[in-house]
């Protein structure tokens, strides 16, 4: 458990899983404690206990949502999202939120954006 204090406190919220992903309530005859506090970029402390509270925190965090949007864009288009404009992440995130977090809608929006605002390729 000490490694999570050094690396990342979020790991404590996953302590109920062993090294190969099996669920456990005890380790070495001691109850597993999955409680942790995480400091956000804004400096707020968030209390987490277990994987469900971690998942809820991540799903509701706008930074995590924007990272998802950026990673999906770059995976699909194979280009850095910044090449499509400095507001592209924010614009796609706003669309994602407005669509009630529809991944299908986000994929369509990314494809439409990339096809209409693509990077010009050099002529060979």
Residue ranges and their predicted role:
Residues 1-74, 86-103, 107-124:
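Active-site substrate-binding loop specific to GH73 endo-beta-N-acetylglucosaminidase modules
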Residues 76-80:
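Core structural elements
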């Amino acid at each position: 458990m000490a490694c999570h204090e050094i690396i990342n406190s979020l790991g404590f919220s996953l302590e109920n899983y062993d090294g190969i992903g099996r669920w456990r309530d005890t380790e070495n005859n001691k109850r597993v404690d999955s409680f942790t506090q995480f400091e956000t970029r804004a400096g707020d402390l968030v209390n987490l206990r277990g994987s469900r509270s971690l998942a809820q925190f991540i799903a509701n965090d706008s930074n995590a949502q924007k990272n998802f949007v950026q990673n999906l864009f770059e995976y699909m288009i194979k280009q850095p999202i910044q090449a499509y404009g400095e507001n592209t992440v924010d614009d796609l995130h706003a669309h994602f939120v407005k669509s009630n977090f529809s991944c299908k809608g986000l994929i369509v929006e990314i494809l439409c954006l990339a096809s209409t605002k693509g990077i010009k390729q050099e002529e060979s």
